[in-house]
Amino acid sequence: MQIGFVGLGKMGAGMARRLLRGGHSVVATDRSEFAVSAVAQEGASPAADLAALVAALEPPRTVWVMVPEGGATESVVAVLGKLLARGDLVVDGGNSNFKDSRRRAADLSEKGVLFVDAGTSGGVRGLEAGYCLMCGGERAAIDRLAPALTTLAPPDGWLHTGPAGSGHYVKMVHNGIEYALMQAYAEGFELFTASGYELDHAKIAALWTRGSVVRSWLLELAAEAMRKNPSFEGVAPWVEDSGEGRWTVVESVERAVPAPTITAALQARFRSRQESSYAARFLNALRNEFGGHEVRKKG
């Protein structure tokens, strides 16, 4: 099928290439001329901007958006809403908030434009291994998009999750679980460092990927990371969060659904960014006040 592709970052470029290798016709655009040139060398038709991309597509058009969530996605979808016609389809494959996706679907529907929110997992290795795709939207839109989804995903690697917003909702929870898994692995391997045993962390992680009940792709990546840099030399103890973990925690509060493990994993990331924790210094001082406990001085 013919598909317009907006956004050629780390994942977007890989997805465009996978579509090309699967025999699809891709018209691509990005703010980076270098990124557009790179996929054009592999067979994509370059477009200078969104207007040029839409003009190059045959109706009914399908445009896949793969840009950062928030303002970038809002801007691109708004422009596409003005350029596209009834029967065209917009796919948001980024990590948008599911509430935004529901709103965008409703706004585009008023113009007769279809919308699919496609939660995408697979990272930079998805080009070769395929991408897991969680897709919300009308059945007609999903059916039309199915050839591209089948190419992008590994066997049985995509699912119509329900109406608009459901794809990004499922991806949000997916990422919340990812936070918790990563934190559990990190805590376990930190315990190894204090065990008194001279353990090879990379070999243990690799071992656990073979038949263990805690095996996962994340653990495979951890084994590779520890093999390359066993002590994580030069890696700062600063852990960013990209938004979905926060949204998962907020949703759990709004729904009154306990999610203590995911919440703790998110809070651990916040703590990692504090060079000097006020709360820890508060506790240190308070113990001295009520019990005369020794205060460990800074520096």
Model-assigned labels for residue ranges:
Residues 134, 144, 165-293:
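Helical "substrate-binding/catalytic lid" subdomain
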